[in-house]
């Protein structure tokens, strides 16, 4: 869907492509990335203030992707940064510096960040799809 919004729709709609869709998605990505970065900074500050370790990196899954658009790259980065935030929150929680409720709330927020962007992608995709379908219907109807 992200490919359809960033690559396919601009090629099909050309001048009729709604640039506000792309700007809206960029804003959504930036907002969620900012939230994740704030959580990473807050968690690192808490670990440093308490003199605690940030823990060992867990087993890393290799990531292989053919990324063709800046927003796709930003989406992958958002997942990776949210995962780092969750790892740091886990380290804080395991060392007793974060309550169970605080851990659940903060890790839940980090899990929702990429899902929030996914919702934005789905909405933009639906709007672009409607415009493309209308364009095709108009073309198929011929000149009037």
What is the meaning of each model-derived region?
Residues 1-78, 84-87, 91-93, 104, ...:
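Polar/charged low-complexity regulatory segments
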């Amino acid at each position: 869907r992200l490919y359809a919004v960033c690559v396919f729709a601009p090629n099909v709609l050309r001048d009729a492509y709604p640039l506000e869709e792309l700007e809206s998605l960029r804003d959504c990505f930036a907002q969620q990335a900012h939230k994740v970065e704030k959580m990473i900074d807050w968690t690192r500050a808490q670990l440093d203030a308490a003199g605690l370790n940030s823990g060992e990196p867990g087993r890393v899954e290799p990531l292989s992707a053919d990324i063709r658009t800046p927003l796709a790259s930003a989406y992958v980065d958002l997942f990776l940064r949210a995962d780092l935030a969750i790892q740091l929150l886990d380290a804080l929680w395991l060392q007793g510096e974060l309550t169970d409720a605080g851990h659940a709330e903060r890790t839940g927020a980090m899990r929702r960040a990429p899902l929030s962007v996914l919702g934005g992608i789905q909405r933009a995709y639906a709007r672009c799809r409607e415009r493309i379908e209308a364009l095709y219907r108009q073309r198929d109807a011929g000149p009037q």
